[in-house]
């Protein structure tokens, strides 16, 4: 198992530090480290602190902040940037861009779970500039070009 450095910036997280909920969990819950309830109106986007910072320190890794499925499906609360990408050399506090795409005001309470953090492998590549590609079956076929499911 990889180990990464985590800096707890909000002491309330020391009681319940980020952890995998089950052995099969891919993501760790990120919490809203706010002092008072925060009302997010329809169409509003706001940055919410998570009370923690990470330093992956390995260019072969990156972190991704993803939405929690229940918040999006039940309340229309998703990430304002859709996915947050955290580079291996970033060391600042993790912030979550919360967007209310729903039709009703939503209240975030202190320490509510607002997003998930996953760690993913990264492959940096070099580019070989070419004039043409070798032919493939798909070619330039794009959106919907492979037929119906």
UniProtKB/Swiss-Prot annotation:
GO MF annotation terms: dUTP diphosphatase activity; magnesium ion binding
Intrachain S-S bonds: none
EC number: 3.6.1.23
Kinase in keyword set: no
One GO BP annotation of this record: dUTP catabolic process
Key words, A-Z: Hydrolase, Magnesium, Metal-binding, Nucleotide metabolism
Catalytic activity entry: dUTP + H2O = dUMP + diphosphate + H(+)
Broad enzyme group: hydrolase
NCBIfam families cross-referenced by the UniProt entry: dut, PRK00601.1
Biological role stated in the UniProt entry: This enzyme is involved in nucleotide metabolism: it produces dUMP, the immediate precursor of thymidine nucleotides and it decreases the intracellular concentration of dUTP so that uracil cannot be incorporated into DNA.
Similarity remark: Belongs to the dUTPase family.
Name recorded for this polypeptide: Deoxyuridine 5'-triphosphate nucleotidohydrolase
Source organism: Dechloromonas aromatica (strain RCB)
